[in-house]
Design a protein with these regions (language model features):
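Short cysteine-rich clusters marking metal-coordination/redox-active sites
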Residues: 42-45, 83-86
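Generic alpha-helical secondary structure signal
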Residues: 28-32, 115, 164, 181
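Short, charged surface segments at domain edges that flank catalytic/cofactor-binding sites
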Residues: 2-44, 69-71, 77
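Histidine-centered nuclease catalytic patch
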Residues: 47-79, 90-105
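Domain-level detector of nuclease and nuclease-like folds
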Residues: 90-165
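C-terminal, charged low-complexity interaction regions
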Residues: 138-206
Length: 206
């Protein structure tokens, strides 16, 4: 019997480009606005820059490639905050003949700020990115979303959320003079698991 995959959204929160001011003609300035708009996460894979070298290691990605559509090079609605892996994988790939033709049949790319992006890609119960449609499969392979680092970083993120919540709960109980020994043990275990995943990431990128 075929195993049923439990689908989760590929991203924790759908990003929204909020900047509507003047057009900045440097990637550096645009990046300052893109980072918070995308929660410091890659637009495509949702990897956090926290575990990927930080803000300076992330790129300004041009959804419609600047090599083909020079007039969109600094248009904010065409820009994305991206990890180096997704940005380099996508490069100047573009299926259409104009800037608005991003998909032809089951090939092409969807702007991650578009709701439709989440109909084509998701995650399984373990945090691996999975394709949900033929178009999603095209994006999955073109952006190399099968890389193990995406699974590791997703789980690092989830464990860190739990670690921080436990730390806050321990602090709250300590302030009320309550017994925290059980929570401290759980927190220590979660920290060990976090370190194990971090070691996996280091080995993956070695």
């Amino acid at each position: 019997m075929k195993e049923i995959k439990i689908k989760k959204p590929i991203k924790i929160r759908k990003p929204t480009r909020s900047y509507t001011g003047i057009m900045w003609i440097t990637n550096g300035t645009n990046k300052k606005y893109l980072a918070p708009d995308f929660d410091n996460r890659c637009a495509y894979c949702d990897d956090s820059d926290e575990y990927s070298g930080g803000y300076n290691s992330f790129h300004v990605e041009h959804f419609a490639p600047k090599e083909k559509f020079k007039h969109l090079e600094f248009t904010y609605d065409n820009l994305l905050y991206s990890c180096s892996y997704c940005n380099i994988s996508k490069s100047n790939k573009w299926i259409g003949s104009n800037e608005n033709e991003s998909v032809l049949g089951n090939k092409g790319f969807i702007d991650p700020c578009n709701d439709d992006y989440y109909n084509h890609l998701g995650r399984d119960q373990n945090g691996n990115i999975i394709s949900l449609t033929p178009l999603g499969e095209y994006i999955y392979y073109e952006l190399k979303l099968y890389l193990k680092r995406h699974f590791i970083l997703y789980n690092l993120d989830q464990i860190n959320i739990r670690r921080r919540a436990l730390k806050a709960k321990i602090k709250e109980k300590e302030e009320h003079g309550e017994d925290t020994r059980k929570l401290v043990k759980v927190h220590r275990l979660v920290c060990e698991i976090f370190c194990d995943y971090y070691d996996l990431l280091v080995k993956e990128e070695a």
